[in-house]
């Protein structure tokens, strides 16, 4: 069986031993300088290949364990960075104005850049205050509430750039298009937003950081994780629970305000609960 090669590169026998995995583990961490989470993602693929070969009877059956690691602390945009990015530009400069609108949209929805790039005018229901997100990582469309502060920003943008000559919105058109009015893909849109950030003196350029920022501020303000799960489009609570754990220290002001111990008062030798109205 050792003569049979996997992918014409690797003999299958290496999948039968822990020795190669240990060496590969060190190679990834030390030479490629990947973190533990990236390492785990790589080894999940490795394990899937090994289990497939076991099912086929090509190699001996054994258990392959992957040690869970604590998620890294999520970086977010700071208050000062957000303030710089939210300074409103002139509507005449389409690209800068469009990017400013997208930053506002990120802060209102926490959507992924792929969802933003595929958003159409018809997905925006201003009467009901609903946004339909048709493109998501989990492939399940969702309907989320449109923040009141976001409405006039989107309406003004659409009136300037996404209406026909009669002032009627182009319902089938993409909201955040390129300079020619055509669809702007997530990669191109992300690159443009990165340039926008740098032009405002913000060195962080990742669009995904806006999801982390949204989640952190949601948790800070006392928002529940079930609603956060729906808004962010996660199928399970696992990821939002991670957000909750990562940003637990940021809930201290809420603990100080709402913890029952802070509402207890001593009166004439008796302890009473004083509920705030």
What annotation goes with each model-predicted range?
Residues 58-87, 134-137, 177-182:
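Flexible interdomain linker/hinge and immediately adjacent N-terminus
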Residues 1-73, 91:
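N-terminal core-binding DNA-recognition domain of tyrosine recombinases/integrases
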Residues 84-113:
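Basic, Lys/Arg- and aromatic-enriched nucleic-acid-binding interface segment
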Residues 147-202:
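Active-site/catalytic core of tyrosine-dependent DNA strand-transfer enzymes
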Residues 258-277:
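C-terminal secondary-structure termini that scaffold catalytic or DNA-interacting sites
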Residues 104, 108, 195, 211-235, ...:
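C-terminal catalytic core of tyrosine-transesterase DNA break-rejoin enzymes
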Residues 109, 118-153, 163:
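Conserved tyrosine-mediated DNA breakage-rejoining catalytic core shared by Y-recombinases
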Residues 76, 135, 232, 236-257:
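Catalytic-site neighborhood detector that most strongly recognizes the C-terminal catalytic loop/helix
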């Amino acid at each position: 069986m050792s003569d049979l090669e996997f992918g014409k590169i690797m003999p299958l026998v290496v999948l039968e031993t822990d020795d190669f995995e240990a060496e590969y583990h060190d190679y990834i961490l030390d030479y490629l300088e990947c973190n533990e989470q990236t390492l785990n993602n790589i080894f999940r693929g490795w394990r899937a290949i090994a289990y497939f070969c076991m099912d086929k009877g090509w190699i001996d059956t054994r258990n392959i364990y992957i040690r869970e690691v604590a998620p890294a602390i999520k970086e977010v945009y700071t208050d000062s960075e957000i303030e710089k990015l939210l300074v409103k530009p002139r509507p005449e400069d389409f690209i800068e104005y469009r990017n400013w609108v997208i930053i506002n949209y990120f802060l209102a929805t926490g959507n992924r850049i792929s969802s933003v790039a595929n958003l159409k005018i018809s997905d925006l229901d201003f009467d009901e205050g609903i946004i339909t997100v048709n493109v998501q990582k989990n492939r399940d469309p969702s309907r989320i509430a449109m923040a009141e502060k976001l409405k006039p920003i989107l309406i003004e943008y659409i009136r300037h750039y996404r209406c026909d000559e009669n002032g009627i919105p182009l319902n089938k058109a993409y909201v955040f298009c390129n300079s020619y009015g055509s669809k702007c893909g997530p990669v191109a849109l992300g690159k443009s937003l990165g340039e926008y950030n740098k032009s405002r003196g913000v060195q962080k350029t990742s669009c995904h950081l806006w999801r982390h920022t949204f989640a952190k501020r949601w948790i800070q303000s006392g928002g529940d994780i079930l609603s956060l799960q729906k808004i962010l489009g996660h199928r399970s609570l696992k990821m939002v629970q991670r957000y909750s754990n990562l940003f637990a220290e940021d809930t201290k002001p809420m603990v100080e305000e709402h913890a029952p111990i802070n509402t207890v008062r001593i009166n004439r030798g008796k302890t009473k609960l004083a509920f705030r109205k």
